[in-house]
């Protein structure tokens, strides 16, 4: 493990020190100075960044290429105010905006492509927004807005907007082709082509990627395999344009869950037999599940399918000048998603073989473990019960955003109507399996040797399964959103701009869930091994059976969001602004399920409401820029809805407050020889009025660091050579609201280099070069394992050291 870190670092250092300094080349000067940038996200019309009263970060295509993020979440780590957990792999990651706590996903921040949501709700169960889009060379730009006007230009987004803007064709034909490989078996091809079919009139862009790799954590199967294609066609006429586009995504990715670690104070070390940097329970030897169902038939699943979305998107955009300074813009999109989700979710931590047998009712030393694969008797020191979770979701979303803009001498007014219909139908089938507590787990059977094989309860497993289909869920959620919004931009003077916005949301939600009963296979006529009936095993004792009784529910939203801001441009390089915003977030999917399946809920179901105040200072030149944005926010009716390993859900409510400051900066130094990029956040998120336990008043919000930042210096060694180092720091957090379970701070170092040879760019990028064991989360599904007194914990660390090499041709 240490050897891999040293080799990675040595290779990078060799290139660094064996070259001399020189000015930055034109080819690799990729960053557009902030003073020249124009932004649209969170604004009614394109506006110079220095004149926008928003906290917004931008990345163009070349900057994204230079950073070469392994996932969308890795790219968003470069945005201040966004605390991002990237340890799940390429998808399924979590983003927390400005200290707003949640169960994960993108609950308070809407992820968009070209100004419309990837899916209307980015925090549906097992359907994180980043499951359904990928960053590749078809991405032309990223704009990431925090807080502010997010609640005016989108629904359920008080935390901000993340807008991935696609490339479009121009009169000049342009293309990019990229080949990439890695230390973990990566083979990836990216292509993008764009140009004009009719000069000045008809433009096209088409591109995508295909990738396969073994995963940084060793699964013994293809951990990531698939790709996407995106295309658009734009026709420009005298008074506007019309654009149509299509996206097809078919990709599967392994999702990494907590592994056992040893905690000694603030020190985290490996659990015996488990590699913290490269180990995982998601392994080929336990990847197949085929079990009988109490309602008849068999249920089969393959872990190698991982998170597997099939996404089809078709959309159109139309803009027309109506005359008299009035323009109309209409965006429409239909999204269809078929998601198969399969993952290994630990059901607690490693247990001694004797203790687990005792838990299953075997007293004394009459327990016997054996390998399912060979039948060989074994005596493991520790065993691990794992949840084999299978979820299928069928989702669709039709959205239309119609807006009118009136421009006058001192500003403009935008008014619009937003309509979105969406549906999510899901089916769960969860079982528990028993394995060795090691890197490459083996399925185990457990029997009570004091009984005869024909005795009731002789076996505690069925081919390694301890609980067959213990949880089934069949449920649906639908949303019908009907929102009116208006935004005013007023230039009071040449330097002073006022902004005011309001959004009225009349939204309707409904759904159903199917009630379940308990069953077993005792009278099914099936056998466990061709001879013995299911009376001989306890694995089927608590099976779930879907019934015919449906529970239907409805929930309506009638809320107003609003914002007021001012931006004062001191001179061409300096500006200050302030903003107040009020927004909300509708209850999430699990909150609906919990509330409407509970006979007498102890809390009313309410939207989460937010109030935010921010002030900002911006200083932009061509070689230096900095933004400093203090903020204060309060939230009411925040619900915590983590799903536990036994299938039950947390149902906790709280109010929170947070005060902090975001800092973002860039500098070109020493005649462009060196570049320095920095973003960081200091905050102090606290609980207020946690329901049912006032002793938690003032505790730090769980999973939220008080300090996190990224700093990345780069040196242009010669006209062709460039090298960089990056440091991600993630401060100490608490896994629980009692603030007893500490997740230590950690730093992750990355490094890389590139060589520009004409239009060809060679690059090597390395991540976590020191093999840091950095924990991003504990195990929210098994909170008892994380108690402060336990030396063995379950947690999800970042990936181990890895390197990627790429060749890119721009033409």
Task: Describe each region flagged by the PLM.
Residues 73-120:
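Extracytoplasmic beta-strand/coil segments of soluble accessory domains associated
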Residues 72-75, 94-99, 109-112, 129-132, ...:
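N-terminal periplasmic accessory domains that precede
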Residues 494, 623-641, 649-738, 773, ...:
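Gram-negative outer-membrane beta-barrel transporters
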Residues 174-176, 181-281, 306, 311-321, ...:
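Transmembrane beta-barrel wall of Gram-negative outer-membrane proteins
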Residues 395, 410-422, 427, 431, ...:
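Structural signature of Gram-negative outer-membrane beta-barrels, strongest in the C-terminal barrel
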Residues 730-734, 754-811:
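C-terminal beta-signal and adjacent terminal beta-strands/loops
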Residues 117-146, 165:
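Short acidic/polar hinge/loop motifs at secondary-structure boundaries
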Residues 241-317, 340-389, 444-477, 481:
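Acidic/polar loop-and-plug regions of large Gram-negative outer-membrane beta-barrel proteins
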């Amino acid at each position: 493990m240490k050897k891999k870190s040293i080799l990675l670092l040595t290779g990078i250092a060799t290139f660094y020190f064996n070259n001399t300094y020189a000015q930055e080349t034109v080819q690799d000067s990729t960053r557009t100075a902030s003073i020249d940038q124009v932004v649209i996200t969170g604004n009614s019309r394109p506006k110079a960044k220095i004149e926008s009263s928003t906290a917004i970060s931008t990345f163009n295509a070349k900057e994204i290429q230079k950073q070469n993020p392994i996932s969308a979440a890795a790219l968003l780590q470069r945005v201040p105010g966004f605390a991002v957990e990237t340890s799940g792999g390429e998808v399924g990651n979590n983003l927390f905006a400005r200290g707003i706590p949640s169960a994960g996903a993108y609950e308070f921040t809407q992820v968009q492509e070209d100004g419309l949501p990837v899916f209307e709700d980015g925090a549906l169960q097992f359907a994180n927004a980043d499951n359904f889009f990928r960053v590749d060379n078809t991405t032309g730009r990223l704009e990431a807005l925090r807080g502010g006007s997010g609640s005016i230009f989108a629904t359920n987004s008080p935390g901000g907007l993340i807008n991935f803007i696609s490339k479009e064709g121009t009169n000049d034909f342009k293309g990019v082709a990229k080949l990439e490989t890695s230390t973990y078996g990566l083979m990836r091809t990216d292509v993008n082509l764009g140009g004009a079919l009719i000069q000045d009139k008809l433009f096209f862009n088409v591109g995508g990627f295909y990738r396969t790799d073994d995963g940084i954590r060793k699964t013994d199967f293809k951990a990531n395999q698939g790709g996407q294609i995106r295309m658009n066609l734009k026709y420009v006429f005298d008074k506007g344009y019309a654009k149509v586009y299509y996206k097809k995504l078919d990709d599967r990715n392994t999702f990494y869950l907590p592994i056992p670690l040893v905690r000694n104070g603030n020190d985290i070390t490996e659990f015996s037999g488990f590699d913290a940097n490269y180990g995982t329970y998601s392994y080929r030897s336990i990847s197949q599940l085929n079990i009988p169902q109490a309602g008849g038939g068999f249920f089969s699943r393959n872990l190698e399918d991982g998170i597997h979305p099939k996404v089809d998107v078709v959309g159109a955009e139309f803009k027309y000048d109506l005359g008299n300074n009035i323009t109309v813009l209409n965006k429409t999109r239909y999204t269809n998603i078929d998601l198969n989700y399969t993952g290994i979710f630990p059901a607690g931590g490693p247990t001694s073989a004797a203790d687990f047998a005792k838990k299953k009712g075997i007293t004394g030393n009459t327990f016997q473990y054996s390998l399912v694969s060979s039948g060989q008797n074994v005596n493991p020191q520790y065993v691990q019960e794992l949840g084999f979770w299978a979820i299928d979701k069928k989702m669709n979303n039709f959205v239309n955003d119609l807006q009118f803009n009136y421009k006058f001498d001192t500003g403009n007014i935008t008014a619009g109507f937003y309509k979105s219909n969406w549906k999510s139908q899901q089916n769960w089938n969860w079982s528990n399996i028993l394995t060795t507590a090691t890197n490459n787990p083996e399925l185990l059977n457990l029997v009570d040797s004091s009984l005869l094989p024909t005795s009731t309860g002789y076996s505690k497993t069925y081919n390694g399964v301890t609980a067959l289909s213990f949880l089934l869920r069949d449920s649906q959620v639908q949303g019908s959103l009907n929102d009116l919004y208006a935004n005013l931009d007023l230039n009071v003077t040449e330097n002073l701009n006022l902004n005011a916005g309001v959004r009225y949301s009349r939204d309707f939600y409904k759904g159903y869930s199917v009630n379940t009963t308990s069953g077993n296979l005792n009278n099914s006529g099936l056998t466990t091994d061709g001879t013995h009936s299911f009376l001989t095993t306890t694995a089927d004792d608590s099976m779930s059976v879907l019934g015919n009784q449906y529970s239907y529910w409805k929930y309506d939203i009638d809320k107003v969001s609003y914002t007021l801001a001012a931006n004062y441009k001191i001179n061409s390089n300096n500006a200050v602004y302030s903003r107040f915003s009020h927004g909300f977030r509708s209850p999430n999917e699990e909150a609906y399920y919990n509330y409407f399946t509970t006979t007498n809920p102890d809390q009313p179901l309410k939207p989460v409401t937010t109030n935010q105040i921010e002030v900002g200072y911006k200083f932009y030149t061509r070689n230096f820029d900095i933004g400093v944005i203090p903020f204060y926010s309060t939230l009411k009716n925040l619900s915590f809805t983590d799903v536990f390993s036994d299938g039950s859900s947390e149902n906790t409510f709280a109010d929170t407050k947070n005060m902090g400051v975001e800092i973002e900066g860039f500098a070109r130094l020493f005649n462009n020889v060196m570049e320095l990029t920095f973003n960081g956040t200091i905050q102090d998120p606290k609980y207020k009025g946690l329901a049912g336990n006032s002793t938690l008043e003032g505790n730090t919000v769980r999973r939220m660091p008080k300090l996190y930042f990224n700093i990345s210096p780069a040196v242009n060694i010669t006209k062709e050579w460039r090298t960089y180092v990056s440091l991600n720091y993630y401060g100490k957090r608490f896994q629980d609201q009692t603030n007893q379970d500490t997740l230590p701070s950690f730093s992750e170092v990355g490094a890389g280099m590139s060589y520009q040879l004409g239009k060809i760019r060679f690059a090597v990028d390395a991540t976590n070069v020191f093999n840091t064991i950095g924990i991003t989360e504990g195990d929210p599904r098994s909170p008892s394992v994380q108690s402060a007194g336990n030396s063995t914990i379950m947690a999800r660390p970042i990936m181990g050291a890895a390197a990627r090499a790429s060749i890119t041709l721009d033409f």
